[in-house]
């Protein structure tokens, strides 16, 4: 198990958010301010040390060795937000329709985290039934469809299940489909709505190789900011950090915390090819 301590003074930007139909936030009106939210350090203690208002779950899994490197609160559920897009994409692939126009749509949905494309595919393919199908296909243990069928971002998911999703992609998907999805996990610097999604894994492995899916939303009732993906030249490790953080820290503060956590999670990993 790993422990996480959050303690430092950083300058952040409070961002007023609007909610889309799927539960993923769109940034508006940045307002400069300062608050005590922190860059994070992660230690190898047996307990998690976090302020009460911050929830965090992490997991690092070595696909080559078939074991966890570290994990903390990996069975705690969080709102998946844009991580649901991974299920939309894998469900589309399983149906044999990851071709033609759908290739471009999935690329936009994953790399630029385009909510409008996700809305369209979610509605067209049965909404919550997508989650149900992928839970069965991947053997997910704690992923639950949203209560409101129109809000795909309200799907709940654990860090352990995120690991299982990436395991499925890397070990069970046909090679052609896997390569398509990996090429789409590019996490462009800015999302389709203009949000800066260069945080977490993409900051933690700036000179290495990563394939990442980020997620964020506000304000129901707090900031949900997640970073997930594969790191290492041969996609050896799955790295997951899920968080729920106070509104006062703003988006910049929340991403700074997640980036600090991600940097420590990958610090001891061998990211070179065998």
Q: Where are these predicted regions, by residue range?
A:
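Second-shell loop/turn segments in exported
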Residues: 72-78, 95-96, 104-108, 116-124, ...
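Acidic/polar active-site rim loop that often engages polyanionic ligands
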Residues: 111-115, 162
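A generic alpha-helix surface/boundary motif
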Residues: 86-87, 115-116, 129
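Active-site SXXK
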Residues: 66, 76-100, 109, 239
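Penicillin-recognizing serine hydrolase domain
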Residues: 2-7, 15, 21-31, 40-65, ...
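Buried hydrophobic packing segments
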Residues: 88-92, 121, 162-169
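N-terminal, intrinsically disordered, polar/charged segments of Gram-positive cell-envelope systems
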Residues: 35-36
């Amino acid at each position: 198990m790993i422990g996480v301590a959050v303690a430092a003074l950083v300058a952040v930007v409070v961002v007023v958010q609007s909610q889309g139909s799927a539960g993923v936030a769109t940034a508006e009106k940045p307002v400069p301010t300062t608050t005590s939210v922190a860059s994070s350090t992660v230690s190898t203690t047996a307990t998690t040390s976090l302020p009460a208002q911050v929830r965090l779950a992490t997991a690092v899994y070595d696909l080559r060795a078939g074991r966890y490197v570290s994990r903390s609160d990996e069975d705690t559920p969080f709102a998946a937000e844009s991580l649901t897009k991974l299920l939309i994409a894998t469900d589309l692939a399983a149906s044999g329709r990851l071709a033609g126009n759908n290739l471009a749509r999935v690329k936009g949905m994953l790399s630029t985290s385009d909510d409008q494309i996700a809305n369209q595919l979610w509605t067209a393919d049965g909404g919550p039934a997508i989650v149900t199908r992928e839970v069965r296909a991947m053997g997910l243990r704690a992923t639950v469809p949203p209560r409101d069928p129109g809000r795909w971002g309200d799907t709940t998911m654990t860090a352990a299940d995120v690991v299982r999703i990436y395991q499925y992609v890397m070990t069970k998907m046909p090679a052609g489909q896997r390569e398509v999805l990996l090429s789409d996990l590019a996490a462009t610097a800015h999302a389709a709505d203009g949000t800066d999604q260069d945080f977490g894994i993409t900051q933690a492995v700036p000179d290495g190789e990563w394939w990442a899916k980020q997620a964020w939303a506000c304000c129901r009732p707090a900031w949900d900011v997640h970073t997930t993906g594969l790191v290492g030249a041969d996609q050896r490790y799955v790295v997951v950090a899920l968080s729920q953080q106070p509104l006062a820290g703003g988006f910049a503060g929340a991403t700074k915390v997640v980036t600090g956590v991600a940097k420590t999670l990958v610090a001891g990993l061998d990211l070179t090819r065998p």
